[in-house]
Amino acid sequence: MTIFILLAVIGAIVQFWVPVNYSMVDYLPENAPSTTAMDVMEEEFDSAVANTRVMVQDVSVQEALAFKEDIAAIDGVNDVSWLDDAIDIRTPLEVADQETVETYYKNDKALFTLEIEEGKEVPATEAIYDVIGKDNAMAGDALNTAISQQKTGQETFNAAAILIPVVILILLLSTRSWFEPVLFLTAIGISVLINLGTNIFIGEISFISQSVAPILQLAVSLDYAIFLLHSFDDYRKTDSPEKAMKRAMKRSFPAVTASASTTFFGFLALTFMDFEIGADLGLNLVKGILLSFLSVMVFLPALTLISYKWIDKTHHKQWLPNRYPIGKFVTKLRIPALLLVALIIVPAFLAQNETNFIYGMGDNPDNTRAGQDENAIKDAFGKYTPIVLLVDKGDLARQEQFVDELSELKYVKSTVDYTGAVGTGIPPEYLEESAREQFFSEHYSRIILNTTTDTEGDAAFALVEDVKEVAANYYGDDYYATGESFTLYDMKQVVQEDNKLVNVLTVVAIAAVLLITFKSLSMPLVLILTIQTAVWMNLAVPYFTNEPLVYIGYLIISIVQLAATVDYAILFTEDYMNNRQEMPKFEAIKKTINEKIFSIGVSASILSSVGFIMWLTSTDPIISSIGILLGRGTLLAFTMVVIFLPALLVVFDKPIEKTTWRPNFYKRK
């Protein structure tokens, strides 16, 4: 017990030294084309792809140049580009190419593009706000990263501040002692703190793991502690505290092990993702489940035996009944339930794959400055997503033809390269070195496409494929392309492949645990069908409501919901199988529903509360989407377990008996 407390204290302290990574791009595989291109560009050129746009209103050209100089002087800001980098502003703007002019300067509004160094997003964006004031605007990927850094920790704290009282209330309503919730939360809280501390050995964690893993660990593993203490309470009626705890541990160990195993192996599947945010979250959750299991089976018994007198002194009447006589009613619904699910399951499966997915961070809410600024810049200058290409610098004639063809592509507004800005008639050696370095490195020539698509979506990804096709025609595989749309295109390819892999791994792993637990060939099919249908229904909702869904949230929840809520089906089915040995199937299912709906309801209410609180407290689109999917998915899983699963167990009673080793089902004499 002392060791657990000591480790928890150490974990609580060292967690603040664990770096948090807020960049989704860093979690792409190293061999992703856009990642390789970014690495090459950083080696060859001093500046990277522009990741921020700043708009200043009501300024002259000279005033805009002054703003440009002030912004460029900020630490962490590189390569500020404006109109003077595209044309000679000493000549009247009226005689210049108006499309080029209006890309940077329009209706007395100046639009700058710049790159903010990774790791300096927060101080740099704050300094830019100081320079431009509250009436001007800033948007871009670097700003989104800065917002995540500033808000994630505070929003996680806010979620915990709401969640813990809610969980305590649920536990108080479902137990008979004021002190028992303290034991539950202490045992799991200790394991959460240890888990946070062990991240120091990983090196860094993603902001998603920081936000989601501790809360999810708490919600999923509270069941283990509840089951142990409820067993302890039962044995206390006849045995001494020490003997009661031994019997409770013996009784609880198989059930808690089975429950933890399904969750453990489900979360373990996430670690096989190539998109390493999933692997990062999976590792954190796997560690969390293992530590929670150890805490419940080692730390909680010792803590309970020390403090059981406080349980006795703080007894109160049970405010909610633990039996609900609804089994007879639910049993009558078995055929309608089966028919309804049969009608829903195929459309739900198809719809959940056809949702409008977002692969990046999504848009900032309109009620935030970032969201309003983004809209203001789009309204004034339109959409802007730069694409950067690196090609062999030895053949300017070929490059000129290449750029001309790129310029003809839909959504390409303008291009910036040597052949367009200077011309093939002037040798690069005639330019000053500082000017030449804007276009050439030692090995490559740089071409920038200013496009008018969003960073992702059908139009953006179609343009990516068109650019790839044109580049391949001119340079084969000897080119590099990057930019946010290219990065998100790669992310889409990676996570879609991950989705196929981890879903198969999750189902196979959980099916194996269920096969061992129930010694039955049919039970894994019955239980996984029940929960997987709830998963498909949950993920189909955004399609029918026409709401975009962040794909990483979709992918994580498709695994987490199955792994976390299959425990409800296990608990229900174990009790049913025991009852079925003593009575006919209808009596067994009614008794199981009456007795288990309360305990399953407590678990589901805690997990769904976690989801809805994450949804309500987070402004991050990824965290928020995980929250709403978890909350809604848990309620759907609960509904399926108490209505659809009983129907399956009753209707397929004979096949279950024949495919189960020694079921010992009750036979009428």
Question: Where are these predicted regions, by residue range?
Answer:
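Structured non-transmembrane domains adjacent to transmembrane bundles in polytopic membrane proteins
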Residues: 30-52, 56-142, 356, 362-523, ...
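Membrane-embedded transmembrane helical bundles of large multi-pass transporters/channels
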Residues: 1-20, 119-357, 472-669
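Membrane-interface helix-loop junction between the first two transmembrane segments
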Residues: 19-27
